[in-house]
């Protein structure tokens, strides 16, 4: 199945009142990028200029999960891998909607995985997207 130009994310960003332009022009971009690329506490739960800015999960990924289930015909028998899962919010929502589905998430952020939602943490692992440990079609 080809994904084409599906966009599940834009609707999440268009609902916010954040100043996206100010965020990238008000601070030293090189410093912010260097800190963000560590994918640690500063990126996830530090100042907004470095990344997420410590937002508490509010359920916003449920809309994306519902859209993906419809678009791809996912079911309780599906196997779902989220590469770059961060704190696993999307997988958390998918698992709530499809409790029988096999979900796994991988990310390069130790901090993200260690600070993911407890309900999904055991499904997440530290891996590089270029060197996944999963067999094809598994």
What annotation goes with each model-predicted range?
Residues 130-138:
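A short acidic, Gly/Pro-enriched loop at the edge of an enzyme's catalytic core
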